[in-house]
Design a protein with these regions (language model features):
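Extracellular, surface-exposed repeat architectures
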Residues: 255, 260, 314, 324, ...
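Predominantly extracellular beta-rich ligand-binding scaffolds that present long acidic/polar faces
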Residues: 360-482
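Extracellular polysaccharide-degrading/modifying enzymes targeting complex plant/algal/animal polysaccharides
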Residues: 1-189, 230-232, 462-473, 481-532, ...
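Right-handed parallel beta-helix
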Residues: 128, 141-152, 169-178, 181-192, 204-219, 232-251, 260, 324-325, ...
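Short glycine/acidic-rich loop motifs that flank beta-strands on beta-rich extracellular proteins
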Residues: 154-160, 194-200, 218-224, 251-258, ...
């Protein structure tokens, strides 16, 4: 028998390069300095140009990409080219000629270059490394760091550098630790990192990071745990506390990154942190896809203020994100808002997001609002519980369940769901298609009209066995327009047993100046994106 002709036998060719439009890539001066940054659905990859054929409009990359280019929904995969001398045309831009070591910079309006302090880091990726030998039961122990600022590392950009699968896990930290136990970082700063901030890796346990400022990062801020379960089993990372830290301003170079990453690690506490301005995820818990056994369990994510995440960059991210089996993990009393996906893709930008295999997780007493795609989203998972939360203004698909499975996917009970687009639950990723239990919930749409439930009326939705003891009624927030989600004394939610959420307790605590520090951050509004271009013309058959 004969087989149909295939463009490629595997994904490998789609990782090596791509077809571009006429004129988008050309042989610039100092061509070898140019970098191509490719936006995949949930990460970016950075490449040098290995080969260029302008006539055929083909560019080949070094290194190759971890993900096939055009994977998922990105048929019009976004990319940009940077570090090109000819593109230096606006204030605030710079270009580095690697051959001569010359840095060219276009000053900002009113900037006096005679008074500018310019710092070029000479440390390559890691500034401080704690090197215990946990495999030999030899540890670095009982140290306290107070009031120290760890600053300035370079990032590694090379044709043979690894590219990431997810979460900037191939990038090095400014402060790295293995076999670190019973240590405290207090009132410290980690800043101006070319890649990641702090990583407590193999064998790190019972450490505390408290009241630290972590900012201006090329990638992610804090990692707890190893990537692989082999290391996690023999050299566990556990019982670490990340409390009352101001973590803000990452993803500057490696954009698919997050504020806090808890990998193959258990019994950790991530509490009372202010986490903002990362391009993929605020807090990520778990690093195992599907239902395979994993060593991530019993983690607590509580009283965090997570906001301004994704920022129009990606189509698959969230404020608080989970991955894999994680029994005993609790997500409680967090406030999550302003999670903005790229408008070019149909999904992404979730408040609380259970991704592949998320299992055994309790989500309670959280307030989620102003997210682009879903306030509560489950790709697929088992026996999760969302109760006593406020989900407001949840975008296109406020409450979702993407993959039907034979087991109970989740229970949704005692929540308040406030919509403003006439839809309470998604019809695209419909919870009605999954095994889900809905009960004792209060729904309201700001239009005053009855919202739809996965495309059907409330009565039809109830006939499926869901929400038979639930109501549609105004929850009587103090001022939902101003995002004041405190409940008035006469709220029907209180009569239904809803427990008031102490919203004001989320985020930083302590001295007034420390608590007020996040309010001093100034953000530019997100620029409008141009409409996507049409698909490129097909190449002629030869």
């Amino acid at each position: 028998p004969f087989n149909r002709a295939k463009w490629y036998e595997s994904d490998i060719l789609a990782k090596q390069g791509f077809l571009f439009r006429n004129g988008d890539i050309r042989r610039w001066e100092n061509f070898d300095d140019a970098l191509i940054v490719i936006y995949h659905s949930w990460t970016t990859s950075i490449h040098f140009i290995k080969e260029l054929d302008p006539k055929e409009r083909i560019v080949k990359l070094a290194p190759i990409s971890t993900w096939p280019i055009g994977y998922w929904w990105e048929y019009n995969t976004r990319y940009h080219v940077e570090n090109v001398a000819e593109a230096l045309d606006q204030p605030g831009e710079w270009y580095l000629d690697r051959g001569t070591g010359t840095l060219s910079y276009w000053p900002l309006p009113g900037e006096d270059m005679t008074k500018v302090e310019a710092i070029a880091p000479i440390v390559r990726q890691t500034l401080v490394a704690f090197k215990g030998r946990p495999e030999a039961k030899r540890f670095v122990e009982h140290l306290r760091f107070r009031g120290i600022s760890f600053q300035h590392t370079e990032c590694l950009l090379a044709p043979d550098m690894p590219t990431d699968q997810q979460g900037a896990t191939e990038r090095a930290p400014l402060v790295a630790a293995e076999g670190l136990r019973h240590c405290v970082f207090e009132d410290c700063e980690i800043a101006h990192a070319g890649e990641n901030g702090l990583w407590l890796d193999r064998g790190c346990s019972d450490n505390v990071v408290r009241r630290c400022r972590i900012r201006d990062l090329g990638a992610s801020a804090v990692f707890l745990g190893p990537k692989a379960d082999g290391d996690a089993a023999s050299m566990p990372v556990e019982r670490n506390v990340l409390d009352n830290n101001f973590i803000q301003g990452g993803s500057h170079i490696f954009r698919g990154s997050q504020g806090v990453w808890v990998g193959r690690s258990s019994h950790n506490q991530v509490t009372h942190n202010e986490i903002a301005d990362f391009c993929h995820i605020g807090i990520s818990v778990g690093h195992s896809w599907g239902y395979a056994p994993t060593s991530a369990h019993d983690n607590l994510v509580a009283f965090n203020h997570v906001h301004h995440i994704s920022n129009g960059m990606f189509s698959d991210g969230g404020g608080i994100y989970t991955l894999g089996i994680s029994p005993g993990t609790v997500i409680r009393n967090n406030v999550v808002h302003d999670v903005t996906p790229t408008p070019l893709m149909p999904v992404g930008g979730c408040g609380i997001y259970h991704d592949e295999g998320s299992t055994g997780i309790l989500v309670e007493n959280n307030v989620v609002y102003d997210v682009g795609a879903a306030a509560y989203h489950q790709h697929y998972g088992r026996e999760n519980v969302a109760r006593n939360n406020i989900f407001a203004f949840g975008g296109r698909d406020p409450i979702t369940c993407a993959r039907p499975e034979e087991h109970l996917s989740y229970t949704f009970e005692g929540n308040i769901a406030l919509s403003n687009a006439g839809q309470a639950t998604s019809d695209h990723f419909s919870p009605m298609k999954c095994k889900t239990e809905f009960r004792r919930n209060l729904y309201w749409d700001t239009s005053g009209k009855e919202p739809l439930f996965s495309g059907v009326s409330f009565a039809e939705w109830q006939r499926t066995g869901r929400d038979r003891d639930s109501r549609i009624a105004d929850p009587q927030f103090y001022d939902a327009k101003r995002r004041d989600f405190r409940l008035k004394p006469g709220s029907p939610a209180l009569a239904m047993g809803f427990r008031p959420i102490p919203i004001e307790q989320a985020g930083l605590y302590g001295e007034a100046a420390w608590v007020a520090a996040p309010s001093k951050v100034r953000r530019e509004p997100l620029p409008p994106l141009p409409p996507p271009p049409p698909p490129p013309p097909p190449r002629p058959m030869v």
